[in-house]
């Protein structure tokens, strides 16, 4: 794994649940690729996860990835909680089914292809990559709602 990629991801939702969007900004050797999409009835957490999944899916070969997210849910889920969810058969400590297990499993599959370094940043404080991912996620929401950007 020699290729080094930065991946900035975000999710947005107008209502929770409600129309939502995800965004991902890939940066490789100074070249940027923007990805976004949305769903008519979803949650902010599902969109945060989808942004990370779609960004990693876009990589055609194993890479060194620095994935930057403003989602504590994604960050803690992948770095702290998932190991125990998997041991318990995708159940929480309270023996409840893990919410969004379908997406967590897809994310786990994508992460296993790469060497991912997870980085959390506070949202909406002007971090350039995070702000771009936020704009892309909101573009996804707007497209689902039929608003042209």
From Swiss-Prot:
<dbReference type="Pfam" id="PF00075">
    <property type="entry name" value="RNase_H"/>
</dbReference>
<feature type="binding site">
    <location>
        <position position="10"/>
    </location>
    <ligand>
        <name>Mg(2+) 2</name>
    </ligand>
</feature>
<keyword id="KW-0460">Magnesium</keyword>
<feature type="binding site">
    <location>
        <position position="70"/>
    </location>
    <ligand>
        <name>Mg(2+) 1</name>
    </ligand>
</feature>
<dbReference type="GO" id="GO:0003676">
    <property type="term" value="F:nucleic acid binding"/>
</dbReference>
<dbReference type="InterPro" id="IPR002156">
    <property type="entry name" value="RNaseH_domain"/>
</dbReference>
<dbReference type="InterPro" id="IPR036397">
    <property type="entry name" value="RNaseH_sf"/>
</dbReference>
<dbReference type="InterPro" id="IPR012337">
    <property type="entry name" value="RNaseH-like_sf"/>
</dbReference>
<feature type="binding site">
    <location>
        <position position="134"/>
    </location>
    <ligand>
        <name>Mg(2+) 2</name>
    </ligand>
</feature>
<feature type="domain" description="RNase H type-1">
    <location>
        <begin position="1"/>
        <end position="142"/>
    </location>
</feature>
<keyword id="KW-0540">Nuclease</keyword>
<dbReference type="GO" id="GO:0043137">
    <property type="term" value="P:DNA replication, removal of RNA primer"/>
</dbReference>
<dbReference type="GO" id="GO:0004523">
    <property type="term" value="F:RNA-DNA hybrid ribonuclease activity"/>
</dbReference>
<keyword id="KW-0378">Hydrolase</keyword>
<dbReference type="GO" id="GO:0005737">
    <property type="term" value="C:cytoplasm"/>
</dbReference>
<dbReference type="InterPro" id="IPR022892">
    <property type="entry name" value="RNaseHI"/>
</dbReference>
<comment type="function">
    <text>Endonuclease that specifically degrades the RNA of RNA-DNA hybrids.</text>
</comment>
<keyword id="KW-0479">Metal-binding</keyword>
<keyword id="KW-0963">Cytoplasm</keyword>
<protein>
    <recommendedName>
        <fullName>Ribonuclease H</fullName>
        <ecNumber>3.1.26.4</ecNumber>
    </recommendedName>
</protein>
<feature type="binding site">
    <location>
        <position position="10"/>
    </location>
    <ligand>
        <name>Mg(2+) 1</name>
    </ligand>
</feature>
<dbReference type="GO" id="GO:0000287">
    <property type="term" value="F:magnesium ion binding"/>
</dbReference>
<comment type="similarity">
    <text>Belongs to the RNase H family.</text>
</comment>
<keyword id="KW-0255">Endonuclease</keyword>
<feature type="binding site">
    <location>
        <position position="48"/>
    </location>
    <ligand>
        <name>Mg(2+) 1</name>
    </ligand>
</feature>
<comment type="subunit">
    <text>Monomer.</text>
</comment>
<dbReference type="InterPro" id="IPR050092">
    <property type="entry name" value="RNase_H"/>
</dbReference>
